[in-house]
């Protein structure tokens, strides 16, 4: 992990109140798809007081010539100044961090489960898979409140047509007073995952979403009893204490507590959205 000087190249709205930010890729910066960075806004950054650091998953694939993050924009002391910053504004990047890389077992399927802006690490992975043209089974279950809030929706639909073996399962769970939607509206649960992954060869599972989604998913995995014991944690927030496996798998920056639920390590947040990653074969019988 290194520290790099960079600058903002530009930004764009990719969904309602959701922006992608593009940064100059520093010389020598290398990362694995699914990893994240810590983005520091310098002391002279316009509009920023003391809130200068956030962790973000990288959206771009390693072969791309710029670094991209995406985030929901709220009126915070960090995000609002970032949204209003002009191209060319200097920033500092520390990273890469995190271990959400794909397993090196091409005979096993990949199941990704994303809630909202949790799609970001999977965009990096899918773009990399498409560039490498690796024909292995990949299923992405992607949940949002409404279509207009779904980041990278059009790109994901295009990837489904382009990437051999990739299947996209979309669900919009709050369709009142929204755009018309004829697709799935259930929350992602064990039954939906079973339906989407039926017949896949010994899949590995990756989950990225908010605390309530993490809690929903850990219970059925624990009940299945066949989840491999490797869980990784990534958290874009402030420092806290971790211990045991969680500390060994990730730098200790988080505002949540690690608990045990049904014998599986789960996470239950207090503020900020979080990413929780589980790797295993919960419904495959492996």
Language-model segment annotations:
Residues 119-131:
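Histidine-anchored nucleotide/phosphate-binding helix
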Residues 95-106:
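A short, basic/flexible loop-to-alpha-helix module at the beginning of a structural domain
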Residues 2-4, 78, 137, 141, ...:
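Reductase modules of NAD(P)H-dependent flavoproteins
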Residues 107, 131-138:
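Conserved S-adenosyl-L-methionine
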């Amino acid at each position: 992990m290194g520290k790099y000087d960079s600058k903002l190249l530009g930004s764009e709205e990719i969904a309602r109140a959701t922006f992608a930010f593009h940064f100059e890729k520093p010389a020598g910066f290398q990362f694995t798809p699914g990893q994240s960075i810590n983005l520091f806004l310098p002391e002279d950054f316009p509009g920023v007081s003391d809130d200068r650091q956030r962790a973000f998953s990288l959206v771009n694939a390693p072969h791309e010539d710029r670094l991209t993050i995406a985030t929901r924009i709220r009126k915070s002391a960090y995000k609002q100044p970032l949204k209003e910053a002009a191209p060319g504004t200097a920033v500092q990047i520390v990273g890469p961090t995190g271990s959400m890389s794909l397993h090196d077992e091409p005979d096993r399927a990949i199941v990704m489960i994303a809630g909202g802006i949790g799609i970001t690490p999977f965009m990096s992975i899918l773009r990399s898979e498409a560039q490498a043209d690796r024909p292995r089974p990949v299923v992405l279950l992607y949940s949002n409140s409404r279509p207009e809030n779904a980041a990278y929706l059009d790109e994901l639909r295009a990837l489904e047509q382009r990437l051999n073996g990739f299947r996209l399962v979309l669900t919009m769970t709050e369709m009142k007073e929204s755009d018309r939607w004829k697709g799935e509206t259930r929350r992602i649960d064990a039954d939906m995952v079973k339906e989407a992954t039926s017949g896949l060869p010994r899949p590995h599972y990756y989950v990225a979403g908010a605390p309530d989604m993490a809690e929903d998913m850990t219970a059925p995995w624990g009940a299945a009893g066949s989840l491999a014991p490797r869980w990784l944690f990534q958290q874009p927030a402030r420092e806290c204490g971790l211990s045991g496996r969680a500390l060994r798998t990730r730098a200790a920056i988080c505002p949540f507590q690690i608990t045990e639920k049904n014998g599986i390590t789960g996470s239950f947040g207090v503020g900020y959205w979080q990413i929780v990653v589980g790797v295993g074969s919960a419904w495959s019988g492996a």
